[in-house]
Amino acid sequence: MINYPLASSTWDDLEYKAIQSVLDSKMFTMGEYVKQYETQFAKTFGSKYAVMVSSGSTANLLMIAALFFTKKPRLKKGDEIIVPAVSWSTTYYPLQQYGLRVKFVDIDINTLNIDIESLKEAVTDSTKAILTVNLLGNPNNFDEINKIIGGRDIILLEDNCESMGATFNNKCAGTFGLMGTFSSFYSHHIATMEGGCIVTDDEEIYHILLCIRAHGWTRNLPKKNKVTGVKSDDQFEESFKFVLPGYNVRPLEMSGAIGIEQLKKLPRFISVRRKNAEYFLDKFKDHPYLDVQQETGESSWFGFSFIIKKDSGVIRKQLVENLNSAGIECRPIVTGNFLKNTDVLKYFDYTVHNNVDNAEYLDKNGLFVGNHQIELFDEIDYLREVLK
């Protein structure tokens, strides 16, 4: 029996040496390594600015929060934001926490991203923002989304936590909107233990992110900035001046040091993931009872999803038991249909556009297995044998 886990370590001696260099420095809190990582991160993905935080979830939190603190607020309580019905929980929680009215839209059962036709119907004069989610490595069709937005004053945001390294028309996923978020949790494309990042080209947004990442103080702002104007030269006072209701979601310095080494390896990681995907797609084309995710642009293939074909008679519970018995780790597709979580949704101000039939079908008939940054041809052959 072959062991086929959901994820595997992306580290070697370079990451352990990076950790040791931080330990030797005795500077454990956010510092120069994090700054270097942010500079390299922005360069890697083609953004002007990058802000590292403690997780992809806190990246989403700061992305939404920042829109309330611009000189002319980009969003206010009660504004409508459109989201797909399938994503991770912390895509949605900041929307509730900042009092936004959330409109859920169905997904495309093939790409697993927001359904373009449903989005087109859902956008109204009340829509102030669209939060797209690039699911399991697959970028959205941003050409179509931008056509829908047209010249309207609608903010485009991206939760790209599962799709680092994906591209659409040679542009990196996570850089199509005003802001995009990334995750570097263990099972993702790179791993910094815990970690996340926000990218933007907007200087005011960037300065707000720097401020609210660490207590809402001015300490991490440049002398001339878009939050306070010009900082005082009195460091004794300025270092403890608080101007925005922020958080403490700073990353550890060792996460920055690890990230520097991981970014160097990212092109190779993505290349191997795509080769695995090519092999996987060939093995599972025309499968008798399973459909696989349809690629949009150039996916970075976080994992390999399956949707049980309608009228196949196959029951997911039995499929999961078979995979687990064979040593193949599998999971639901993200959270499935998030609208099933009625206990938490009672705290939301939300509506549902028409129906979410595809999200409901995925919720009951979808699952995914892992893709890794190492060759998986033997594991994929084994997977195909188990899923005869």
From Swiss-Prot:
Q: What superkingdom heads the lineage?
A: Bacteria
Where are the disulfide bridges? none
Describe its membrane topology.
Answer: Single-pass membrane protein
- Name the principal localization, coarsely classed: membrane
Could you tell me which Gene3D superfamilies the record lists for this protein? Aspartate Aminotransferase, domain 1, Type I PLP-dependent aspartate aminotransferase-like (Major domain)
Tell me its EC number(s), please.
4.2.1.168
- A Gene Ontology molecular function term of the record: lyase activity
**Gene Ontology biological-process annotations:** polysaccharide biosynthetic process
- Hey, what's the signal peptide range on this chain? none
Record CDD domains: AHBA_syn (cd00616)
Task: Please tell me where GDP-4-dehydro-alpha-D-rhamnose binds in this chain.
Answer: K26, M27, F28, T29, R219, E329
**Record keywords, A-Z:** Cell membrane, Lyase, Membrane, Pyridoxal phosphate, Transmembrane, Transmembrane helix
- The top EC class, named as a word, is lyase
Reaction catalyzed? GDP-4-dehydro-alpha-D-rhamnose + L-glutamate = GDP-4-dehydro-3,6-dideoxy-alpha-D-mannose + 2-oxoglutarate + NH4(+)
Would the keyword Transmembrane helix be found if you checked this record's keyword annotation? yes
Q: Which residues bind pyridoxal 5'-phosphate?
A: G56, S57, W88, E162, S183, N248
Membrane-crossing residue ranges in chain numbering? 49-69
Catalytic residues (UniProt): H188
Which cellular components does GO assign to this protein? plasma membrane
The pathway noted for it is: Nucleotide-sugar metabolism; GDP-L-colitose biosynthesis
User: Where is L-glutamate annotated to bind?
Assistant: H215, R250
Q: Where in the cell is it found?
A: Cell membrane
Q: How does it assemble?
A: Homodimer.
Per the entry, what this protein does is: Involved in the biosynthesis of L-colitose, a 3,6-dideoxyhexose present in the O-antigen region of lipopolysaccharides (LPS), where it serves as an antigenic determinant and is vital for bacterial defense and survival. Catalyzes the removal of the C3'-hydroxyl group from GDP-4-keto-6-deoxy-D-mannose via a combined transamination-deoxygenation reaction. The catalysis is initiated by a transamination step in which pyridoxal 5'-phosphate (PLP) is converted to pyridoxamine 5'-phosphate (PMP) in the presence of L-glutamate.
Can you say what this protein is called? GDP-4-keto-6-deoxy-D-mannose 3-dehydratase
Q: Which organism is it from?
A: Escherichia coli O55:H7 (strain CB9615 / EPEC)
